[in-house]
C-alpha cells in the first residue's frame, strides 16, 4: 500500500506561496525594466531651468485651537474649509480671512475634510469612523450641526474623503485598510476597494471629467490606482521605504506624485507603469506630509515635518525654493483651483495662503 502523504503544514505552504509571489514580483520588475529606456531628467535636459522665485505668506488664517489636519478649496477659488484636532471644521473666506461657518464635531482629530463641487456643502470625518456632510447656507448664524448627514461608516478612523465630480457621491479612505464610494443621499456604499495591507492614509481622484479612477496610498508603502466601476486595483507601485502620506494626480491625469515619511516625494507615470522621478536631498531628513502640483504641472509643492515647504521643479528634479513661516509641521497643502496661490495648514494651529 502506498505510504500516505504527510499533510502539508500551513507554515510550509505559506513559505512556498511567499517565495512564488517574490519570484513573480521580480519577473514583473524585469519586464518593466525592458520598457525602461529613458530617464525623465534626460528628456528634460534641453528644457530651460527655472530660476529662483519668491513666494510669500499673503494671509494667515487663525482660529483653530489645535493642530490643523486637513483643508480643501472651494471651486469658487475663494473659500477654504479646514479641520483640526480641536474637533472644529471652519469655512474661511481666503481674501478677507473671515470665518463664514464653524461646526464642532462630536469627536476630536477631524483628519479629513472636503468641499463639494457645487460649493454648497462640506464633508468631514476622523476618529468617529464616519464621514458627515454638512449643507452650507447663506445664513451665517444657522446651526449647521442640525442638518448633518452621516454618509459613510468605516470600522476604523476616516483618513481622507473627496467628492467625485458631483455632490452626490463621495470617496473615503480609512484606517481599516479600505477605500469606499458612497451615495450621499442614501448613505449606501456603492463600491468598496480592498487591496492595501495596512491603513490607507490618502486618496486623490483623477482630474478628467470622466474620472473613473483614483489613487490611494497608505502604511503598506504602496500606492494603488483603482477603477471605480469594478472596484479593482489596476496598477500598484511600491518604491517608498515608509508610509505614503499624500498622493496627488498630475494635472493631465497621466501621472501622480506621492509624499512619504521616507523624506522623499516621487513621481509615477501611469502610461510607463513606473516611477520616473525622486525628489529628495540629503539635507531633507523629515517626512513629506502633503504634496500638490501647480496648475501647469511644472512645480511640485511638498509640505514637510521640519516645518518647511519645498518647491520642486518636476521635470529637472531640482528644488527651486524653500518656504519658511510655519512654526510646526506642515500637515496639509493645496493649490487653489485657479493656480494663483496655495494654502498650507500646520500643527501650529494656523493656515497660510502663499503667492
Curated annotation (Swiss-Prot):
WD repeats lie at residues 63-102, 105-144, 153-194, 195-238, 239-278, 280-322, 325-355. GO terms for cellular component: cytoplasm; heterotrimeric G-protein complex. Gene3D superfamilies: YVTN repeat-like/Quinoprotein amine dehydrogenase. It comes from the Eukaryota. One of its GO terms (biological process) is swimming behavior. Enhances GTPase-activating protein (GAP) activity of regulator of G protein signaling (RGS) proteins, such as RGS7 and RGS9, hence involved in the termination of the signaling initiated by the G protein coupled receptors (GPCRs) by accelerating the GTP hydrolysis on the G-alpha subunits, thereby promoting their inactivation. Increases RGS7 GTPase-activating protein (GAP) activity, thereby regulating mood and cognition. Increases RGS9 GTPase-activating protein (GAP) activity, hence contributes to the deactivation of G protein signaling initiated by D(2) dopamine receptors. This is Guanine nucleotide-binding protein subunit beta-5a. It comes from Danio rerio.
Amino acid at each position: 500500500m502506498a505510504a500516505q502523504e504527510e499533510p502539508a503544514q500551513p507554515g510550509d505552504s505559506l513559505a512556498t506561496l511567499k517565495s512564488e509571489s517574490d519570484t513573480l514580483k521580480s519577473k514583473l520588475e524585469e519586464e518593466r525594466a525592458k520598457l525602461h529606456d529613458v530617464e525623465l531628467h534626460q528628456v528634460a535636459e534641453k528644457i530651460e531651468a527655472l530660476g529662483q522665485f519668491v513666494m510669500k505668506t499673503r494671509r494667515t488664517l487663525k482660529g483653530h485651537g489645535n493642530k490643523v489636519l486637513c483643508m480643501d478649496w472651494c471651486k469658487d477659488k475663494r473659500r477654504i474649509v479646514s479641520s483640526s484636532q480641536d474637533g472644529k471644521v471652519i469655512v474661511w473666506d481666503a481674501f478677507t480671512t473671515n470665518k463664514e461657518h464653524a461646526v464642532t464635531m462630536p469627536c476630536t482629530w477631524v483628519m479629513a475634510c472636503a468641499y463639494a463641487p457645487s460649493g454648497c456643502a462640506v464633508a468631514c470625518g476622523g476618529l468617529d469612523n464616519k464621514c458627515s456632510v454638512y449643507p452650507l447656507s447663506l445664513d451665517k448664524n444657522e446651526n449647521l450641526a442640525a442638518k448633518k448627514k452621516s454618509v459613510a461608516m468605516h470600522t476604523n478612523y476616516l483618513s481622507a474623503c473627496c467628492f467625485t465630480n458631483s455632490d452626490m457621491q463621495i470617496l473615503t479612505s480609512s484606517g481599516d485598510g479600505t477605500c469606499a464610494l458612497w451615495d450621499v443621499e442614501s448613505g449606501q456604499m456603492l463600491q468598496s476597494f480592498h487591496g492595501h495591507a495596512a491603513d490607507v492614509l490618502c486618496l486623490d481622484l483623477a482630474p478628467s471629467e470622466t474620472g473613473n479612477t483614483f489613487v490611494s496610498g497608505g502604511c503598506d508603502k504602496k500606492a494603488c490606482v483603482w477603477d471605480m466601476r469594478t472596484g479593482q486595483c489596476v496598477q500598484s507601485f511600491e518604491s517608498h521605504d515608509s508610509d505614503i502620506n499624500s498622493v496627488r494626480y498630475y494635472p493631465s491625469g497621466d501621472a501622480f506624485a506621492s509624499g512619504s515619511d521616507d523624506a522623499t516625494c516621487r513621481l509615477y507615470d501611469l502610461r510607463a507603469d513606473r516611477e520616473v522621478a525622486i525628489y529628495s536631498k540629503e539635507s531633507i531628513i523629515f517626512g513629506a506630509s502633503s504634496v500638490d502640483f501647480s496648475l501647469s504641472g511644472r512645480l511640485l509643492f511638498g509640505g514637510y515635518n521640519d516645518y518647511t515647504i519645498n518647491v520642486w521643479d518636476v521635470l529637472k528634479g531640482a528644488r527651486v525654493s524653500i518656504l519658511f513661516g510655519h512654526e510646526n509641521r506642515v500637515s496639509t497643502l493645496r493649490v487653489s483651483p485657479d493656480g494663483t496661490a496655495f494654502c498650507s495648514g500646520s500643527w501650529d494651529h494656523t493656515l497660510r495662503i502663499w503667492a
